[in-house]
Amino acid sequence: MRRAFPSKDRPLAQMTASIPVALSAVLWLAVTPAQARPVCMIVASTSGTILHEDGDCRTRVTPASTFKLPLSLIGFDSGFLKDAQDPVLTYRKGDPDWGGKAWTQPNDPASWLRHSVVWYSQRITRALGTAELTRYAASFDYGNADMSGDPGKDNGLERSWIASSLKISPVEQVLFLGKLIERRLPVAANAIDQTIAIVESQTAGGWTVSGKTGTAYPRKADGSFDRARAWGWYVGWARRDGRTLVFARLDQDETQQSVSGGLRARDALLGEWEAIAGSLPR
């Protein structure tokens, strides 16, 4: 690991037995679908103080499509991405198409993030190359910053962030997001502005919640994908009355599901957000 993680806020740790925090933990379990196991729910200030942490938030796993947040910063900072509508790229035969009709249509940066289009990500990564992507990821302290891909397959530019070499923990997600919001990342201000502008937002309990979902299947011992154990991420930030919090939620399925893990993690977080946010110290 590149650096030691900040420890939990000690006064908060002493408060975890209080009724509001205990209630939010119960709601966290209750809102999660029975087929998914909650792995981690973590909330922090943008400065990096951990305000709420349930579960295993320190183990690194694949970021899946949540990697599109740093990749958007990289794309805009490098000049490959121009603005929300430029460049418009077209689907090519052989590109990933499992995301449905939206993936086989022309896409711009806004629709790329909205529909989580894998091939659009691959156009960015191939234009930048492994060395440059690794440099950016390391400068962001983004997990292990390993963009090499599957061992011996030379596929890092295609899928290093999808159940492959790149791994990040929930606590590292919120630390990265805090630096994004506070503009402490080594990229141009315009790259941050453009990225924030294309991230989808929802409302929950008077908060505006912005974030990115991610879903990926872990590998079995034989290298095949375990479709019954999908990871589901939702990471982002929430704003209300001048206050901004960053969060990461990670679930893992126990049986194969028809709706992606990331979408279910997002909906579960939105359902519990008001209770969790209300339990936090100011």
Where do the PLM segments sit?
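Flexible glycine/proline-enriched surface loops and loop-helix/loop-strand junctions
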Residues: 52-58, 105-106, 114-121, 152-161, ...
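Short, well-structured active-site flanking segments
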Residues: 77-94, 187-192
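Bacterial N-terminal signal peptides
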Residues: 16-30
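A short, well-structured edge-of-sheet supersecondary motif
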Residues: 32-55, 236-237, 249
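Active-site SXXK
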Residues: 61-86, 112, 173, 247
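Structured C-terminal helix/loop/strand segments within mature extracytoplasmic catalytic/sensor domains
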Residues: 57-60, 126-129, 181-282
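Mid-domain, small-residue-enriched loop/turn segments at the edges of structured enzyme/sensor domains
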Residues: 100-105, 109, 125-182
